[in-house]
Amino acid sequence: MITITLPDSSTKTFDGPVTGEQIAKSISEGLWRECVAVEVDGAAMDLSEPIATDAAVRLITTRDPEGLHIMRHSAAHVMAEAVQRVFPDAELTIGPVVEDGFYYDIDMEPVSEEIFSRVEAEIKKIVSAKIPFVRKEVDKAEALDRYRDQPYKTEILNEIEDDTVSLYTNGDFTDLCRGPHVPHTGFVRAVKLTKISGAYWRGDQNREQLQRLYGTAFFSKKELDAYLTLIEEAKKRDHRKLGAELDLFSFHEEAAGMPFFHPNGMKLWNALLDYWRLEHRAAGYVEVKTPVMLDRALWEKSGHWENYRENMYVSVIDDNQYAIKPMNCPGGMLLYKEKRYSYRDLPLRVAEIGLVHRHELSGVLSGLFRVRAFHQDDAHIFMTPDQIEQEIFGVLKLVETIYSTFGLGFHLELSTRPAKSIGTDEQWVKATAGLRAALDAYGKGYAVNEGDGAFYGPKIDVHIKDALGRTWQCGTIQLDMSLPERFDLSYIDAGSEKQRPVMIHRVIYGSIERFLGILIEHFAGKFPLWLAPTQAVLLPLNDDMIPYAREVRQEFEQAGIRTEIDDRSESLNKKVRQAQIDKIPLIITLGGKEKEARTLSVRTLDGQVRHGVSHEAFFAVAKEHIAKRLQTPVVFA
């Protein structure tokens, strides 16, 4: 007899080995039809695999996130088979699931998106046939013989240490794969190829260049259509497109991956950092600045030279090797060591907007999202062990304050001790307990990623959600037990003994360049008044009004409102249209009537028009919006 325990703690008994499919059918036909795989004692398996011992079982359905992941894995196989039908000489490599879909790297002649319709036609045939995915475990030697003419698969096989490997076959197509897969190709109900790009085998630019075909898949056409609509909206909001249209930033081949910020971009940048500094001063942080280039010996001491050397830019000065910093932390350690600290001086909260450089392959550079030079809003908090909870809680509240100002929701994930780590059991228990206690006190809920912490300490990752519902990992609250040890940091406790401080390394914006890119897309370039590069534009009705417009601009600037004048010899309608294209929140018309009455005709970006607004009333509303950093539309009575 075999006893199967279900998630609700109920049990089912079977006379002998049983499959997930049989378990599902024993519960209901409807459940069986929606099952894609089964989780047995925490491990995902095919529905057709026998379960030979007592086990805790969870049926994975089309409603579960894991179900979608498994189906997309199967969709990658279906796409690969379809490609081989269209291009018989194409040689397959690997095809993993990624966020929002999957891809397959294929060795074939360069192709374009023109092939998508032909490949998708074959996909439809494969899906309609509802071909079963059949798993077969074979000796590694047999697999090597099977793939002897396929060097990519042979390379993968030679790296596998197990004596047996699994192959999956659906119809005439077989691929090396761990699985699991959906029962048959009919579960891949709605598929769309999305893009194609070049990729190096194993990410090594010295290896073969492949064609990477991306796709996505859903369990229903309705879900696919909703996703494609989202993608189209995302294209309209693409920060690279809006960055050019709004004259915010640019890139040049003379400095690949290093953005050039234009005057409009710098206004946005400064507004972002002015706000950051305001909140950090209020939260008790001091700001510092450390050098961009530091001696190799420092990077050896910090461990970066050993673990991060390939991503660092190095130079030789006076026969000494220096590295441009990829991270701000080591410089912060040197600053701490300059002074002698007592327990009464702690916690010490030190923040830095530091410029860092990291070498990224040219193929992965992507606008402001993936660059080689960027600024990071690092902070290091030095504290005693019993201050961990209160300091983590304080950072969480600061995170909430800052993200809510931009209308960004977020969720939290706690990552605990990995298999390889430094520090004692006692240190890890106390550190993790401090993070948990702070999260529990914060009270907003969190997920736990067991074993996913850094080797030097547990961490909290903060994932923000933008206006399109996309999530971005920006903030990190990392407890670091490595650097205080490496740099021999200390403080004097109440008993006049030296102690090692606990250190939190945290970022909120993360890469400021990347965060700006996220904000551009979040707001679709229509920034709230306080953040907009140009907050108001003055449109003189004729050349005679230009001197008056200059007077008004000076008045606006003195009131703290970033203002420009459009004095081109164009019609008012064209000027208004240009201001709308430039997404300027307040568009103000100045004519003889307005000059005589000392009033303003104000048009907002959302189409509201108000005539006869006094300067005093205008300033009262605009200054309140800016001071309070409101996201709501500006409304004039």
Swiss-Prot record:
Cofactor detail note: Binds 1 zinc ion per subunit.
Organism, scientific name: Desulfosudis oleivorans (strain DSM 6200 / JCM 39069 / Hxd3) (Desulfococcus oleovorans)
Classification via Gene3D superfamilies: 3.10.20.30, Anticodon-binding domain, Bira Bifunctional Protein, Domain 2, Threonyl-trna Synthetase, Chain A, domain 2
Family assignment from sequence similarity: Belongs to the class-II aminoacyl-tRNA synthetase family.
Region (Catalytic), start-end ranges: 238-528
Localization per Swiss-Prot or TrEMBL: Cytoplasm
The protein's assembly and partners: Homodimer.
Pfam families for this protein: HGTP_anticodon, TGS, tRNA-synt_2b, tRNA_SAD
Its job: Catalyzes the attachment of threonine to tRNA(Thr) in a two-step reaction: L-threonine is first activated by ATP to form Thr-AMP and then transferred to the acceptor end of tRNA(Thr). Also edits incorrectly charged L-seryl-tRNA(Thr).
Gene: thrS
NCBIfam families in UniProt: thrS (TIGR00418)
Stated name of the protein: Threonine--tRNA ligase
InterPro entries: aa-tRNA-synt_IIb, aa-tRNA-synth_II, aa-tRNA-synth_II/BPL/LPL, Anticodon-bd, Anticodon-bd_dom_sf, Beta-grasp_dom_sf, TGS, TGS-like
This protein's record includes keyword Transcription regulation: no
GO-annotated cellular components: cytoplasm
GO process annotations (BP): threonyl-tRNA aminoacylation
Binding residue positions for Zn(2+): 329, 380, 505
HAMAP family: Thr_tRNA_synth
Known catalytic reactions: tRNA(Thr) + L-threonine + ATP = L-threonyl-tRNA(Thr) + AMP + diphosphate + H(+)
UniProt keyword annotations, A-Z: Aminoacyl-tRNA synthetase, ATP-binding, Cytoplasm, Ligase, Metal-binding, Nucleotide-binding, Protein biosynthesis, RNA-binding, tRNA-binding, Zinc
UniProt EC number: 6.1.1.3
Domain of life where this protein originates: Bacteria
SMART domains in alphabetical order: tRNA_SAD
Main location: cytoplasm
